[in-house]
């Protein structure tokens, strides 16, 4: 499957820089614990840590419900009319809702980030590898939750995804699409296996 695909994630970024308001402080709870309870808590934490290591799986991408009658809308003046995006060779991230059928951009929905993966079809993607990238994208969005929604933050997410795609390529999970319109091998020369001794050699 050599086609570009997109995924949307709901983002909870801070709008502090845009709105000029004060960031709400989260209330912190203080809990006092006796020494006996601390020992019980430590034992339960060790058991939980062991279970987490066994079951560590990629983050499930949260589905975003499709919307009907989406119209292209620009940002309002209260946000400075900014077009927030991060565009790299293989990853495009927009702070907007993009209708997957009509490709209408609704920039007013800045609580959604849309990922467009490999728009030039440079790689051959399977459903499993696309899912891995979308899961990693969801992890990054969750990691940057609360950070200011700026182009810098989106570029950080985009560059991390580029590195992850390079890792998938070097691990052999994806490969170059030799039927692509342009063969430029942007992530290095293709590697092939000689003599099956387990070492990859450059072409």
Curated annotation (Swiss-Prot):
GO terms for molecular function: oxidoreductase activity, acting on NAD(P)H, quinone or similar compound as acceptor; quinone binding. GO terms for cellular component: chloroplast thylakoid membrane. Residues 34-48 have a biased composition (Low complexity). Its main location: plastid. Residues 1-21 form a transit peptide. Part of the chloroplast NDH complex, composed of a mixture of chloroplast and nucleus encoded subunits. Component of the NDH subcomplex A, at least composed of ndhH, ndhI, ndhJ, ndhK, ndhL, ndhM, ndhN and ndhO. NDH shuttles electrons from NAD(P)H:plastoquinone, via FMN and iron-sulfur (Fe-S) centers, to quinones in the photosynthetic chain and possibly in a chloroplast respiratory chain. The immediate electron acceptor for the enzyme in this species is believed to be plastoquinone. Couples the redox reaction to proton translocation, and thus conserves the redox energy in a proton gradient. This is NAD(P)H-quinone oxidoreductase subunit M, chloroplastic. It comes from Populus jackii (Balm of Gilead). The gene is ndhM.
